[in-house]
Amino acid sequence: VPALFAEKARVATLDAAKMAGIEVISLINEPTAAACYYASLPNVKKITGNVLVFDLGGGTFDCSMINIQGEKVEVITSRGDKWLGGKDFDKELINVINQKYKKETGQELDIENKYSLYMEMAEQIKRALSIRDKQAEVIEGPAGPKKIEISRKEFELSIQTHIEKLKMLMEEVLDGSGLKPENISHTLLVGGSTRIPIVTKTIEQVMKKPPLKGVNVDEAVAAGAAVYAGLQSKKSLNEAQKQAISNVK
């Protein structure tokens, strides 16, 4: 569950699992799960000490400071915005596309009635701009199809307000933990939106070092929860074996 989940939300999660017939051994905070995932990777240097988990998904943002000592993972403090994510970047891109289309044709796009179509196209452009400086797409509109080109710089300018919000929340986490960037060993990335260059650049500016890369940020939490479950199952099995041996005696 998100680290920011209050007790009521955690209870609701447990109730939902129970209704679905799922036996819950324990709830794990998403930053803790992400840390378990990174720690399980053979190609990643051992993660210990104070770690920042930066989780930017499609619809929400969570930033947590955690402390790792061996198998013990403690969430020190968390900040976030449950209404800030990659979809907000897509909406800003739609506005840019609409402005360019209007400049070319004199007419605006019918965003209200074709919202899903334009959101899908905006996401495609956003992903393309993570690996190249410019992207051109043929946009269907009331004045007919028009080829529109958008640069990474234009995209970054359109989402600047959201980037500043991410930066502010990161700084709040640092203040809340009483730690400085030099006291943080790693920044762990979670969520597909962390692939956006301006996002990782902002993290590096705040933390004074680049975040860890080269991992599957989309599946970090789910994979980490599986690793955690495996560790819990192993402990349970070991305890059961010890109990069985004790009973034989």
Task: Label the model's feature ranges.
Residues 1-249:
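Oxyanion-binding/catalytic loops of NTP- or PPi-dependent enzymes
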